């Protein structure tokens, strides 16, 4: 009898662990609907809609945390890219611009990390503020390539635009959470 009870409890616990997150997951149609409210639907569907963590997301707070994580991943990838391309920019303007981007991506990384931590605490206004600061640092990295000297093509435009678009998604989710 005791063995049957233990087996039954293990089965129910396993069932709860496996089924509970899925049963309470945010429906995929809600993610599609959210993405349709963004300025770049295919981008949103690519980065949020296909994220393997989305099926386990219970609510918009979890989706917000995933979007912040996606931003942090883009920032980290850009930082790695900076290290790879830095030697291609040996002129004074290129070196200065790469250093501005390296510094700004350091700021963005720290801000998105803290935003994620505050998102866990549901401190949404602080999340919004930090996501803006991180995004503005990335935007400045894009803009520095057009300031103070000859215009150059930024080697980080891909990452800069991804962070900018993810920021729009973060702000959209933020607005839904606070209104």
UniProtKB/Swiss-Prot annotation:
Any one GO MF term held by the record is: pectinesterase inhibitor activity
Q: Which GO terms describe its biological process?
A: regulation of seed germination
Chief location category:
secreted
Q: In which tissues is it expressed?
A: Expressed in seeds, buds, and mature flowers.
Q: Name one GO cellular component term.
A: apoplast
Instruction: Print the keywords alphabetically.
Output: Apoplast, Disulfide bond, Secreted, Signal
Disulphide bridges, residue numbers: 35-44, 101-141
Highest taxon in the source lineage: Eukaryota
Q: Which residues form the signal peptide?
A: 1-25
**Compartment(s):** Secreted, Extracellular space, Apoplast
Q: One Pfam family of this protein, by short name?
A: PMEI
Primary role = Pectin methylesterase (PME) inhibitor that targets PME from seeds and modulates PME activity and pectin methylesterification during seed germination.
Which protein family is it in? Belongs to the PMEI family.
According to UniProt, the name of this protein is: Pectinesterase inhibitor 5
- Output the lineage of the source organism: Eukaryota, Viridiplantae, Streptophyta, Embryophyta, Tracheophyta
């Amino acid at each position: 009898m005791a063995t049957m009870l233990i087996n039954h409890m293990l089965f129910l616990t396993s069932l709860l662990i496996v089924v509970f997150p899925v049963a309470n997951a945010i429906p995929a149609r809600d993610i599609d609907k959210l993405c349709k409210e963004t300025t770049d639907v295919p981008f949103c569907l690519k980065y949020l809609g296909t994220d393997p963590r989305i099926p386990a997301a219970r609510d918009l707070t979890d989706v917000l945390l995933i979007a912040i994580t996606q931003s942090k991943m883009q920032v980290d990838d850009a930082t790695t890219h900076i290290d790879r391309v830095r030697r291609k920019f040996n002129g004074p303007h290129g070196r200065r611009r790469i250093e501005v981007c390296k510094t700004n991506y350091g700021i963005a990384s720290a801000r998105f990390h803290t935003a994620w931590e505050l998102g866990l605490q549901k401190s949404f206004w602080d999340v919004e503020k930090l996501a803006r600061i991180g995004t503005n640092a990335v935007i400045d990295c894009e803009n520095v390539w057009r300031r103070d000297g000859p215009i150059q093509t930024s080697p980080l435009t891909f990452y800069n635009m991804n962070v900018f678009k993810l920021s729009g998604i973060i702000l959209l989710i933020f607005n839904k959470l606070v209104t």
